């Protein structure tokens, strides 16, 4: 069930990518987060989709919490207008802090870091360490191959169908909201 005023972690690229639809989707997601009075939790950067997303939330009256490691802040990559900025020492601390602050996890298009961050949250769900929903915001089928990989894991019995259904793939904010509202954590499997 979607809580009122959730904190939603969004992982995304520090680049805007090569499709205008990626930035458009980041803007739409930011507007949706603000319109629902939710708070964005993200990597704290001003570049790429991260900056587009944070700006969209802020421009629509929303709250934004950034979590950035010192080495990135020192390179002047932190967004200057955030509601809160947490500075941590390492990427591992950043991921842990974002996890502690958030009630849902979403991945916009991004690179290996984006994929690694959302995948870790999915993995934690499967072992009972993350009771919150994880979803890919699948802009222009960006995550089509990822979806196929999870389906292949089911086919080859490395992932149960029940656990696969706990991994969201949404192409609109309406689909994303419906997934978050209906989410129930996976049952922890017994070995």
Tell me the role of every PLM-derived stretch.
Residues 95-127, 135, 186-191:
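Active-site/ligand-binding-proximal alpha/beta "capping" segment
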Residues 58, 125-132, 158-159:
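Arginine/glycine-rich "motif VI" loop of SF2 helicases in the C-terminal RecA-like domain
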Residues 63-65, 127-137:
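Gly/Pro- and small hydrophobic-enriched strand-loop and loop-to-helix capping segments
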Residues 2-101, 139-174, 178, 183-191:
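A cross-family phosphate/adenosyl-ligand binding-site feature
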